[in-house]
Amino acid sequence: MRYAIIADIHANLAALMAVLTDITKREEIGGVWCLGDIIGYGPDPRQCIELLRRTNHICVAGNHDLAAIGEIDTSDFNPDAAAACEWTAKQLTAQDRVYLKGLPLVIEKDDFTLAHGSPRQPIWEYILSISTARENFAYFKSKFCLVSHSHVPVIFKYGKTGSCSFSQFSTNKELVLGEERLIINPGAVGQPRDGDPRASYAIYDSETKKIKLYRVPYDIAATQARMVEQRLPLRLVGRLSHGI
């Protein structure tokens, strides 16, 4: 069975639609695994929640998902993120809030552990360095862990001797899952930060034991126009053009 792995949609409906359309063009998908932050930053939180809920999916909670419903404090958010969160909170329906509040922090699925930030601190921790990755391997029992939060597609590998290495998860690269334990980040659908503005997602094939990363162009200008219309911070608008 094949599963689509998506993350950090961030209320970017045009990007989510482009990714879901791209997924349907490929072989049959058994479901969608979402790594959180469905909302925040972007202009269409309700629509993204609704569209995701129409798919056969599982999803963990992200920090923006919980912040928008008052489950976590936004004092650590930068001013633009906090402003977008405040706006997002006003857009959500009661049904949206119930759905978001019900999202688990961690999901174990097959050989994978799913978390938004890290298995050690699912909501807040970024896995950006080899040292942080090495420490986190002790916090999940499965062979592989899927994370997001940094919006950058990367792979951390834990060797048998306790060593840890890092590599970029390149577009169209097939990652063969073997005996080595891995922490894998598929990048972001709605706000990439690796210098490539295209939406990012991956597909896992449970039969071949491979994960492949894909990039999908979408109508960035349409999302930006919606953000300006909703008076969201201009810095958030501009960064979509550059994938930063």
For each feature predicted by the language model, list its residue ranges.
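Acidic, His/Gly-rich catalytic cores of divalent-metal-dependent hydrolytic chemistry
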Residues: K160-I244
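Active-site environment of divalent metal-dependent phosphoester hydrolases
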Residues: H10-A15, G40-G42, H64-I69, R120-P122, ...
